[in-house]
């Protein structure tokens, strides 16, 4: 079971987001989606678990307990729905996620996504570090962290003991 407390730090404005599983490498994403309100949509997937991709209503679905990270990208053009949809299409091409958003883009979004200048601009955005990210920790992470801290405490005790001699 993962802790999703960090969702409260997500911005509440338009953006493209990607979910990574614990074994996904650098540019691999399990799911890419878009939202007019990032925090609300990510909460719908991971906390409420009532999004179409998380309810298990199809053969392939999102398992919130397997999501280790959420990355997001923001851009000034994301406030326009057609541009947000176009950017999602470019993100699909760039990252080739395991699962895609189930929405159908508008004709205008398809046209925008085929504009070479726009495509280059979005490729640059998605090639750089995401605008933000959060990690969702699970019990195994906590156990490993405790072990690491115990080892550090033992090392510090040894240093103190050696200085007292």
Identify what each model region corresponds to.
Residues 1-14, 22-28, 36-165:
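Boundary/linker segments flanking structured domains
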